Amino acid sequence: MGSSEAETPAKANKASAPQEQQPPATSSTATPTVYPDWTSFQGYPPIPPHGFFPSPVVSNPQGHPYMWGPQPMMPPYGSPPYVIYPPGGIYAHPSMRPGAHPFAPYTMTSPNGNPDAAGTTTTAATAGGETNGKSSEGKEKSPIKRSKGSLGSLNMITGKNCVEHGKTSGASANGTISQSGESGSESSSEGSEANSQNDSQHKESGQEQDGDVRSSQNGVSPSPSQAQLKQTLAIMQMPSSGPVPGPTTNLNIGMDYWANTASSSPALHGKVTPTAIPGAVAPTEPWMQDERELKRQKRKQSNRDSARRSRLRKQAECEELAQRAEVLKQENASLKDEVSRIRKEYDELLSKNSSLKDNVGDKQHKTDEAGLDNKLQHSGDDSQKDTN
């Protein structure tokens, strides 16, 4: 009877505890009625929310420039300042996890739990954090199990240990006490010491099993396979089953324009053999190598074309000079013929001049002799007349 009288004020206190928490809840529900339209109290122009974090809710055109909603550190029964902060529906938490966006400031983790190319994040650390969190959670739940340590053989016979454990854990999370906890406290006074010792040993083994099940449900197992997640795996390129879809290159590319020599040279396919090097980045893509090879071949072909153009230009100049030399030779030969002809004519003129000079000299001598004879005859006639 004494135990039943002691339990009645405890039940009254437990029943009055939820009633004491009711007035703040009513005050929180009544505060939004003071300012029905919080957008009318905004002193900022209508600015749409930032586009980098997509929200599943359609953005309000009268959105507040601040990016955060009601702070989670505030008590749920308090009256949040609706004049300053907008409702949580407008600027909700981003729907994507940190690091999912390629241009996010967070690092992106690889699917196998290893760091990316930057090498800053691993899932092993998060797994360790989860194990620490679960261990602390187990420590917090241990007083609840110890409070149930006085249960007698009733739990061992009926098998209600796990059921009551789930009910008490749910009740502790909700801040209330269930009926099963009360029945456990009532039955605790009726258990014997021997049964309580056996029950404590059973709960210790159950706690270890519960910890193992909880760790297995969270994906953290103490097996040695966990060490494989911390090993850095090389990023390798998977070889394709079919041919590489990149363009095939040729060493004599562009030469088929001048000569059909493309069929004599083998074609190069852009396949890269995957090499497993720890901590190395992926090798260059085949199309990048093909592009470099194409650029190299184009540069070589342009050099060949420029050399060929220079040879053709020099050959054309040589041919032109040869033609001009032939023309000049023909002109020289014609000039030589003309000079020889003129020399012959000069010789003929000289011979004619000499013959004419001879003829003129003979005629002058004859005339001189004839005149002398005439003078002699006149002088003889004059002498004869004088003598007579």
UniProtKB/Swiss-Prot annotation:
Domain bZIP residue range list: 293-356
Any one GO CC term of the record: nucleus
Tissue: Highly expressed in roots and at lower levels in stems and leaves.
Residue ranges, annotated region (Leucine-zipper): 321-356
Biased composition (Polar residues): 169-179, 214-231
GO biological process: defense response; regulation of DNA-templated transcription
Keywords: DNA-binding, Nucleus, Plant defense, Stress response, Transcription, Transcription regulation
Protein family membership: Belongs to the bZIP family.
Protein name as it appears in the record: bZIP transcription factor 1-D
Organism expressing this protein natively: Triticum aestivum
Underlying gene: BZIP1-D
